[in-house]
Curated annotation (Swiss-Prot):
PANTHER family in the record: ZINC FINGER CCCH DOMAIN-CONTAINING PROTEIN 18
Residues with the Phosphoserine modification: 666, 1056
Compositional bias annotation for Pro residues: 622-631, 783-800, 807-817
Gene (UniProt): zc3h18
Chain intervals with Acidic residues compositional bias: 144-156, 167-176, 203-214, 233-245, 290-306
Name of this chain's protein: Zinc finger CCCH domain-containing protein 18
Comp. bias intervals (Basic and acidic residues): 53-73, 82-96, 190-202, 261-289, 530-615, 632-646, 818-833, 933-964, 1012-1029
Keywords attached to this entry: Coiled coil, Nucleus, Phosphoprotein
Chief location bin: nucleus
Keyword Acetylation: no
Disulphide bridges: none
Length: 1148
């Protein structure tokens, strides 16, 4: 430290400076190059002091000279006397004994001359000095006072120095150099102990050395002795100590000579008295640690001593000026207490251009001025001298840093002053930039947060922005334009609670015009009143805050709106789910109670009305999803194209088609009920089947709904199979005729037992012939069938369908599967004719029905009856098909025909969805419902519902049935031979399909792939179904529909999880039945049962019946293949539509 501390070494490299150079070094290293220019060096500081002599209170010229030489020694600008003294005393002593001599001299000076102590203290920048400075609360004046006190108390030499200034000056010059060295050491120690005193000496390290004379020379030597060990750190410590002792003696002698001591005496005495104890303790520390700095300080002090420019006045004025170099560095960091040794790496950041870094005795505003707040009393020179005394303004922790005129930014950097400094006036440019940034940020936030931002920005943003831009007009704009903004905000919410309003209110207060805002006058208007500039700033702040509040309010409003929207969406979803659940529950209840709930769902009714409006277009539209899926049916394609748009209204579909299908008095109601049940399970029984199907339908899609209506029709038809028969509603007529009306049921028994499976086949082909319907028959049909007789549940239910279907079918006239087949052909034909009559538009259904019949002709004894039902159901809609499957088991032909009529669109659209959803809905309702309605009613209900809504769907369903037959052809061919005209063969296939039923999911995929497999499955199942005559209906439905859809479930889970899922659900079987009906009616009913089934499902199955009959017997294989292809396409389309709808419908 001694070497770096030597004044000659003061211009040391940053490394040396980092080593903890004395204040002189700190000043000199930066100062020697730059401070020489800036007067940073001690010599320059002294020169500055000389210039400052008037500033400092008129330091004697000798003092100024001393300061100049001391300061100039470092920058090599020392006067001749200073050079001489520095050369012989300082240079020799400094280089050799700087550390020890300075420590000793500082101790002596502390004893001898407080001036020297004070001056030296600021000059010796010790790394510890900052801490000392922090410790010192003294302002430069205080330091001077302390020096004066110390001088008075410690030495009368100060007075003597005042007496003999001229004579003592010469001696003092020499001694002051030594004293400065000592002071540097003392200041280092004092800075450690008393940062205040050293800070008072900030002007020059020599001045800082003045602190050394805190104690009498006796005390100083004592301290020097302990300091000597510290000085001993340097090899020259002993010599320095000796020289320091000599210098102390000289200084004792010279102190009376020091004229500046008079000025310094009062301050220095006070400083010395204060610093006496501190310096004693710190002298040892500083001597040990800051010997080098002390040497520099001593040199500086000696330089100052020559002229004895170290006046308390100088110190006062010099309260550490801000380091010009640091400020040049332009980077004021708040690293504060970072060690100086980091400075090299952080020179750019911490030291700016000042290489001294933390050690610099001048204030580095953010770095080394911490703790100087109290020390520097914000002397007027500092704050006023923003640039020159800026360093002093910082009141850097190092009192050694003399108040340099260069440290202009001191005010900002003074930690205590910073508040005044922080509010530096913002240039218009800066303000504009800031405002633009704020506006941009706010606008961005608003855009993001406020839903109505586009609307609001015109009204709100302008007011806010104008305020900031035109501050002159603040009052008026705040009163006027901003008021508008506020009012707008107020409309949104209570911004007044926010501080912005208060600020604005304050601004208005100042303006004298305030809006009556709640919080306006409360917050902080008063502080702003005094200073309008400040008020403007606060106003700006308040405005910004208010704007932020407005933004927050807007954001909140946007969020609330979004939340409300989300809530509404969730509510809609919940309502859909609830409707679906209601439909399911109602279907279940209806199944259990056997009473159709026509208006269970309120929304479904509304939606039904809407759907009726849209369904008329949508039944085709509903079909279109399937239509596209089933390119074979161009009508379906057309309707499918519409459906994508109408997908949104899953409920609408079933509504309008059902009303159409339900020309009968009850069908409109049933349709509506079915629509609600489709959308929300309107029918009590049918509504329950429908409800489940509708729950799937509603959640699944409009097809789902159609399906659910169809299923609801099944439950409803179980209540009012009469409805389905006379209603001519496709699903209803089937369902009602078989279930409600004994004769339709009789027809349906034939049709159902036969058509149950044929519809299953009819639906099955679209669905997966064997796969889905059998499970449906087993699962859904058991449920559906159970209402007439539970035996119709899995496997057996097909026969119970004949038998159990007989309960529904027996309702008409209980017919054995065989009779059903015979009857089914007529009934199917009649039903198909009726369907054609009612659903002539659904030619597809007719084709579908015939195809279904033909494809299931083998197992189509039921398949025929069911085939008409299925053709109606199928042409009605795949959904109807899938729903019909379950309802088909009970109301095979009527249900399938109604289902095909109504489900033409919905079934096509929901073919997959419906088969899973509808069959699930019909199934789950059927399970409960079977007991009530034996399932035919239910199945019929769904089928009829499907048939009814399908009236619009019928064209599609007929097309689909045509397609289905093409999809079923192989199945129908295989099924037809086996159960084509034989109710039992048909029943056996359903027997098999019940197992296959289980996999309803296979509705679509299986349909494509499994229609052939379904044929084989049907063949397998047909035998098994044949084995089970009662089950055949169900199995038929399971099997033939499986060919289309039902098989999906049993053997074709791949068909579609939808089928499977309905499979899990009771309604599934109904779609299976509907599906079976369609395929079966074409295969089995094309021969004779097709007509019977058609007649049984007369309203829905007329077209299907004829189609089934024609396509079933004669062109079954060929038509079945072409229709199978069509059905496969339709199934694909339906699956796609279902997938789309599921994606769209959250509930599903």
């Amino acid at each position: 430290m001694d070497t770096p501390e030597s004044p000659t070494q003061s211009p040391q490299s940053p490394e040396e400076e980092e080593k903890g150079l004395s204040d002189n070094e700190l000043l000199e290293s930066p100062e020697s190059p730059a401070e020489a220019d800036k007067g940073v060096s001690d010599s320059e500081l002294l020169n500055d002091d000389e210039n400052e002599v008037p500033e400092h209170g008129g330091d004697s010229d000798s003092e100024d000279r001393d300061r100049q030489p001391a300061g100039r020694e470092d920058p090599e600008e020392l006067s001749d006397v200073e050079d001489y003294k520095l050369d012989r005393e300082e240079r020799e002593d400094i280089h050799q004994q700087e550390g020890a001599l300075r420590v000793q001299e500082i101790a002596q000076k502390a004893i001898k001359s407080p001036e020297e102590e004070i001056l030296e203290t600021p000059r010796s920048p010790d790394p510890v000095s900052p801490a000392a400075e922090h410790e010192r609360p003294f302002t430069p004046a205080e330091e001077e006072r302390g020096d004066d006190d110390e001088e008075e108390e410690e030495d009368e030499t100060t007075t003597k120095s005042g007496l003999g200034q001229a004579e003592l000056e010469e001696e003092e010059d020499e001694e002051e150099e030594r004293r400065r060295r000592r002071r540097a050491a003392m200041v280092v120690s004092d800075l450690k102990d008393e940062s205040s005193v050293s800070r008072d000496l900030d002007e020059h390290e020599l001045d800082y050395d003045e602190e050394v004379p805190e104690e009498p020379s006796a005390a100083a030597p004592e301290e020097d002795e302990p300091e000597k060990p510290a000085v001993g750190e340097d090899g020259e410590d002993e010599e320095e100590e000796d020289e320091e002792e000599e210098k102390r003696r000289k200084r004792k002698e010279r102190k009376p000579i020091l004229p500046p001591d008079n000025r310094d005496t009062p301050l220095r005495k006070s400083e010395d008295s204060r610093e006496g104890g501190r310096r004693d303790s710190f002298r040892d520390k500083k001597k040990e640690e800051d010997d080098g700095e002390i040497d520099e300080g001593e040199i500086d002090d000696d330089d100052l001593e020559e002229g004895e420019v170290k006046d308390p006045m100088d110190r006062k004025i010099r309260p550490r000026p801000i380091c010009r170099f640091f400020m040049k560095g332009s980077f004021v960091t708040m690293y504060g207490n970072v060690k100086f040794f980091f400075f090299k790496s952080y020179l750019v950041f911490l030291t700016g251009n000042c290489t001294w870094g933390m050690i610099c005795r001048f204030i580095h505003p953010g770095v080394n001025d911490k703790g100087n707040y109290s020390l520097i009393s914000k002397p007027d020179p500092f704050s006023p001298n923003g640039a020159p005394p800026g360093g002093a303004a910082g009141g850097g922790p190092h009192p050694l840093m003399p108040a340099n005129p260069w440290g202009a930014p001191a005010v900002e950097e003074l930690p205590p002053p910073p508040p005044p400094l922080d509010p530096p006036v913002e240039s218009a440019w800066e303000r504009g930039l800031r405002h633009a940034k704020e506006v941009l940020k706010k606008a961005t936030i608003r855009k993001e947060q406020e839903p109505d931002f586009e609307e609001k920005r015109f009204t709100v943003t302008i007011g806010e922005d104008d305020r900031d831009f035109d501050k002159e007009n603040d009052f008026f704009r705040e009163r006027g334009g901003y008021r508008i903004t506020r009012e707008i905000r107020d409309a949104g919410s209570d911004p007044y609670g926010d501080p912005y309003y208060d600020y604005e209110m304050e601004a208005f207060w100042r303006g004298g015009q305030y809006e009556n805002f709640r919080v306006q006058y409360t917050e902080t208007p008063l502080p702003y009143y005094p200073d309008r500039e400040r008020e403007r700033d606060p106003r700006e702040r308040h405005r910004e805050r208010e704007r932020e509040r407005e933004r927050d309010h807007r954001e909140r409003e946007r969020r609330q709106r979004e939340r409300e929207r989300e809530r509404e969406r969730e509510r809609e979803k919940d309502s859909r789910r609830r409707k679906d659940e209601w439909d399911r529950d109602r279907l279940k209840r209806d199944e259990k109670e056997g009473r159709p709930r026509e208006r269970p769902l309120r929304e479904p009714r509304e939606k039904k009305d809407e759907k009726e409006k849209t369904l008329k277009p949508r039944s085709p539209t509903n079909m279109p999803p399937r239509g596209p899926m089933e390119p074979p049916t161009k009508k379906d394609m057309l309707s499918v194209t519409k459906r994508p748009d109408e997908w949104n209204d899953p409920w609408c579909r079933s509504k309008s088609p059902r009303r159409r299908p339900g020309f009968m008095g009850s069908p409109p109601r049933g349709r509506r009920r079915h629509r609600p049940s489709g959308s929300s399970v309107s029918l009590s029984n049918s509504s329950r089947s429908s409800s489940r199907s509708s729950s799937f339908t509603g959640s699944g899609s409009s097809r789902s709904r159609s399906r659910s209506r169809s299923s609801s029709m099944s439950s409803y038809s179980s209540h009012s199979s009469q409805h389905s028969s006379f209603s001519g509603s496709r699903s209803r007529s089937g369902s009602f005729s078989s279930s409600p009306s004994p004769s339709p049921s009789a027809q349906r028994n034939a049709n159902k037992n036969k058509a149950e499976q044929p519809p299953a086949a009819a639906k099955g082909p679209p669905l997966k012939p064997g796969a889905l319907p059998p499970p449906r028959r087993d699962k859904g049909p058991p449920k559906v069938m159970p209402s007439p007789s539970l035996p119709e549940q899995p496997g057996k239910p097909p026969k119970p369908i004949t038998e159990t279907v007989k309960p529904p079918n027996p309702r008409p006239p209980g017919r054995p599967p065989g009779p059903r087949e015979p009857r089914e052909p007529p009934n199917m034909r009649e039903g198909r004719k009726k369907e054609r009559q009612q659903h002539n538009p659904p030619r597809r259904r007719t084709v579908s029905g015939s195809v279904s019949g033909s494809s299931y002709s083998g197992s189509s004894s039921r398949s025929r009856s069911r085939s008409s039902s299925a053709s109606a159901s199928r042409s009605g809609s795949h959904k109807s098909r899938s729903l019909s499957v379950s309802s088909v088991s009970s109301v095979s032909s009527a249900s399938s025909s109604s289902s095909s009529v109504r489900s033409a669109d919905s079934d096509d659209m929901y073919a997959d969805l419906a088969s899973p959803v509808s069959s699930a809905s019909s199934r789950s309702p059927t399970p409960g419902h079977p007991r009530k309605d034996r399932g035919p009613p239910r199945e019929r209900g769904p089928n009829k519902e499907r048939g009814k809504p399908p009236k619009k769907d019928e064209p599609f369903k007929d097309e689909r049935k045509r397609v289905d037959p093409s999809g079923l052809p192989s199945k129908a061919s295989s099924d037809m031979p086996r159960s084509g005209n034989r109710g039992h063969p048909m029943h056996p296939p359903p027997m098999g399909p019940p197992g296959g039923y289980g996999s309803h999911k296979d509705i679509k995929l299986t349909l494509l792939n499994k229609q052939q497999t379904d044929r084989s499955n049907r063949k397998r199942y047909f035998p098994s179904d044949k084995e089970r005559p009662p089950s055949p209906l169900r199995k038929r439905m399971a099997m033939s529909p499986d060919g289309g859809r039902d098989r999906r479930m049993p053997g074709r889970p791949p068909m579609s999880p939808r089928m499977e899922r309905p499979k899990g659900q009771g309604p599934r079987p109904m779609p299976s039945q509907g599906e079976r009906k369609r395929p079966l009616s074409p295969p089995a009913k094309s021969s004779g049962k097709g007509p019977a089934a058609a007649s049984a499902a007369k309203p829905p199955a007329p077209g299907a019946g004829s189609g089934s009959a024609s396509g079933s017997a004669p062109g079954k294989p060929s038509s079945t293949l072409s229709r199978r292809e069509e059905l496969l396409k339709q199934l694909k389309a339906v699956e796609d539509a279902i997938a789309r709808k599921r994606a769209k419908i959250p509930g599903k």
